[in-house]
Amino acid sequence: MGKNVVVLGTQWGDEGKGKVVDLLTERAKYVVRYQGGHNAGHTLVINGEKTVLHLIPSGILRENVISIIGNGVVLAPDALMKEMTELEARGVPVRERLLLSEACPLILPYHVALDNAREKARGAKAIGTTGRGIGPAYEDKVARRGLRVSDLFNKETFAIKLKEIVEYHNFQLVHYYKEAAVDYQKVLDDVLAIADILTAMVVDVSELLDNARKQGELIMFEGAQGTLLDIDHGTYPYVTSSNTTAGGVATGSGLGPRYVDYVLGIVKAYSTRVGAGPFPTELNDETGEFLRKQGNEYGATTGRSRRTGWLDIVAVRRAVQINSLSGFCMTKLDVLDGLKEVKLCIGYRMPDGREVDTTPLAAEGWEGIEPIYETMPGWSETTFGVKEHSKLPQAALNYIQRVEELTGVPIDIISTGPDRDETMILRDPFDA
């Protein structure tokens, strides 16, 4: 029986991970975020009530679940407090259910200022970041100058370290980017005001997870963003700053890599992308607008409209390889309802005429690529809210089967609407 399950996106994010994690955590004891920060936007709909989480794991609404923010996550204290306050106002006892790794790097105002200054300076070459300081915080981590949650235990030392790093970043902000300096005293006061709240939630995450594993507890790891945004394996440089793939679980939580039992890849029935970067199947026509409107494709974090296109099997196959996927959950199948035909990208035609069935690595390699499509009949019947596999339209079943054939991975879960119960679990990852 699988006990440790990873849930991650197979595309460019926004696949519907939050809903699936929330659904499957009915059985889990722990839900762990292992990378990213509050640039994620995980939307849950339970009995018609919508909740958008950015930093706190999607298991927080379950009474039986302990939610953990692992060391691979960059943590913005102000964003965490805002999210905690909103949830507590709705009666969710966050402080009883949420734990933090002391090794989480902190995102502070100078990271946000740098993020926005750089995007502004890039002009037409902007990456399309969320402007929340994620990249600069990871830079400080790798440069070994960043502050971490553990630094909050000694406030005097924290103040000294903070002064040094504020001076360092302010020099760059003022003299290179010609932007305003960050106020050291305000940053210090704001962080110290909530330091005790954060340190009270600190645990040894690696030890906790290892003990839970030994006791046979069910653990779920919640990925943010998507495989094709991975810092190493994504469409570089149009990527995020963390490892969004299954490999990030071990480094971002402290669980040994051999202890992952099942990797669930969330795949949207079509493709979307927010921000700049390659997108071979993008549709800038009526069909693209149809998908955007029907799928309500607007970012949960930024509110930006998402780019839309047909499902790219070539890119998804790359996700299968990198993540050693055990199964898929297909989301938003209902968005395709009403289309006369649906298409799957099964290969790329390169600028020199060659046909390939693998993805390039760097963004430059995607330039001039044309998708090669396989066209299938669409369906006029609704799939929205359907909860039995046999009651799906035959054309929709054919589409699902073809995705399985082309990827070599079974679709174990099908989502037909935003609500928790608008889902078919054909094979439970915890039992696989």
Swiss-Prot record:
<feature type="binding site">
    <location>
        <begin position="41"/>
        <end position="43"/>
    </location>
    <ligand>
        <name>GTP</name>
    </ligand>
</feature>
<dbReference type="Pfam" id="PF00709">
    <property type="entry name" value="Adenylsucc_synt"/>
</dbReference>
<comment type="similarity">
    <text>Belongs to the adenylosuccinate synthetase family.</text>
</comment>
<feature type="active site" description="Proton acceptor">
    <location>
        <position position="14"/>
    </location>
</feature>
<comment type="pathway">
    <text>Purine metabolism; AMP biosynthesis via de novo pathway; AMP from IMP: step 1/2.</text>
</comment>
<feature type="binding site" description="in other chain">
    <location>
        <position position="225"/>
    </location>
    <ligand>
        <name>IMP</name>
    </ligand>
</feature>
<feature type="binding site" description="in other chain">
    <location>
        <position position="240"/>
    </location>
    <ligand>
        <name>IMP</name>
    </ligand>
</feature>
<feature type="binding site" description="in other chain">
    <location>
        <begin position="39"/>
        <end position="42"/>
    </location>
    <ligand>
        <name>IMP</name>
    </ligand>
</feature>
<feature type="binding site">
    <location>
        <begin position="300"/>
        <end position="306"/>
    </location>
    <ligand>
        <name>substrate</name>
    </ligand>
</feature>
<feature type="binding site" description="in other chain">
    <location>
        <position position="304"/>
    </location>
    <ligand>
        <name>IMP</name>
    </ligand>
</feature>
<feature type="binding site">
    <location>
        <position position="144"/>
    </location>
    <ligand>
        <name>IMP</name>
    </ligand>
</feature>
<dbReference type="GO" id="GO:0005525">
    <property type="term" value="F:GTP binding"/>
</dbReference>
<dbReference type="InterPro" id="IPR001114">
    <property type="entry name" value="Adenylosuccinate_synthetase"/>
</dbReference>
<protein>
    <recommendedName>
        <fullName>Adenylosuccinate synthetase</fullName>
        <ecNumber>6.3.4.4</ecNumber>
    </recommendedName>
</protein>
<feature type="binding site">
    <location>
        <position position="41"/>
    </location>
    <ligand>
        <name>Mg(2+)</name>
    </ligand>
</feature>
<feature type="binding site" description="in other chain">
    <location>
        <position position="130"/>
    </location>
    <ligand>
        <name>IMP</name>
    </ligand>
</feature>
<dbReference type="InterPro" id="IPR027417">
    <property type="entry name" value="P-loop_NTPase"/>
</dbReference>
<dbReference type="GO" id="GO:0000287">
    <property type="term" value="F:magnesium ion binding"/>
</dbReference>
<dbReference type="GO" id="GO:0005737">
    <property type="term" value="C:cytoplasm"/>
</dbReference>
<keyword id="KW-0658">Purine biosynthesis</keyword>
<dbReference type="GO" id="GO:0044208">
    <property type="term" value="P:'de novo' AMP biosynthetic process"/>
</dbReference>
<dbReference type="GO" id="GO:0004019">
    <property type="term" value="F:adenylosuccinate synthase activity"/>
</dbReference>
<feature type="binding site">
    <location>
        <begin position="332"/>
        <end position="334"/>
    </location>
    <ligand>
        <name>GTP</name>
    </ligand>
</feature>
<keyword id="KW-0547">Nucleotide-binding</keyword>
<keyword id="KW-0460">Magnesium</keyword>
<comment type="function">
    <text>Plays an important role in the de novo pathway of purine nucleotide biosynthesis. Catalyzes the first committed step in the biosynthesis of AMP from IMP.</text>
</comment>
<dbReference type="InterPro" id="IPR042110">
    <property type="entry name" value="Adenylosuccinate_synth_dom2"/>
</dbReference>
<keyword id="KW-0963">Cytoplasm</keyword>
<keyword id="KW-0342">GTP-binding</keyword>
<feature type="binding site">
    <location>
        <begin position="415"/>
        <end position="417"/>
    </location>
    <ligand>
        <name>GTP</name>
    </ligand>
</feature>
<dbReference type="GO" id="GO:0046040">
    <property type="term" value="P:IMP metabolic process"/>
</dbReference>
<keyword id="KW-0436">Ligase</keyword>
<feature type="binding site" description="in other chain">
    <location>
        <begin position="14"/>
        <end position="17"/>
    </location>
    <ligand>
        <name>IMP</name>
    </ligand>
</feature>
<dbReference type="InterPro" id="IPR042109">
    <property type="entry name" value="Adenylosuccinate_synth_dom1"/>
</dbReference>
<keyword id="KW-0479">Metal-binding</keyword>
<dbReference type="InterPro" id="IPR018220">
    <property type="entry name" value="Adenylosuccin_syn_GTP-bd"/>
</dbReference>
<dbReference type="InterPro" id="IPR042111">
    <property type="entry name" value="Adenylosuccinate_synth_dom3"/>
</dbReference>
<comment type="subunit">
    <text>Homodimer.</text>
</comment>
<feature type="binding site">
    <location>
        <position position="306"/>
    </location>
    <ligand>
        <name>GTP</name>
    </ligand>
</feature>
<feature type="active site" description="Proton donor">
    <location>
        <position position="42"/>
    </location>
</feature>
<feature type="binding site">
    <location>
        <position position="14"/>
    </location>
    <ligand>
        <name>Mg(2+)</name>
    </ligand>
</feature>
<dbReference type="InterPro" id="IPR033128">
    <property type="entry name" value="Adenylosuccin_syn_Lys_AS"/>
</dbReference>
